[in-house]
């Protein structure tokens, strides 16, 4: 009990509203620290991520053939798992701001109509994004 209380001082508790259009990141005691478009721009041929969020949104419809700006969620559920992981990784790293050495605990909002498989995909993507615990 004491150990958990001590650890909570060195980790960050976060909430993620993973939306089709926008993603919000809330950090306990700080409020909303990130509000970004849920868009990722990546290279089609090599798969590397070029931009995430607002920067990627600016690229929609303006990219050469080897770059694709896409929304990895549709109707609140994941349609591109790997791209969602890349997006969450970027957002969570920005929310951590390098002040902690422990991975954050994260609560993720999931649409009430999501199936069990869709819910599991959101939790798995969040865990793969480098958090310590996701619910």
Predicted feature locations:
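Nucleotide/phosphate-binding catalytic cleft detector across ATP-hydrolyzing
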Residues: 1-135
């Amino acid at each position: 009990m004491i150990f958990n209380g001590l650890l909570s001082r060195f980790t960050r508790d976060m909430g993620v509203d993973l939306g089709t259009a926008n993603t919000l990141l809330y950090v306990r005691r700080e409020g909303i620290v990130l509000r970004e478009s849920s868009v990722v721009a990546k290279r089609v041929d090599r798969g590397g991520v070029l931009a995430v969020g607002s920067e990627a949104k600016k690229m929609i419809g303006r990219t050469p053939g080897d770059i694709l700006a896409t929304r990895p969620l549709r109707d609140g559920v994941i349609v591109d798992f790997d791209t969602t992981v890349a997006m969450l990784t970027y957002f969570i790293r920005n929310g951590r701001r390098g002040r902690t050495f422990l991975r954050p605990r994260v609560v993720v909002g999931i649409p009430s109509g999501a199936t069990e498989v869709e819910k599991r995909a959101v939790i798995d993507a969040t865990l793969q994004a480098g958090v310590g615990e996701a619910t």
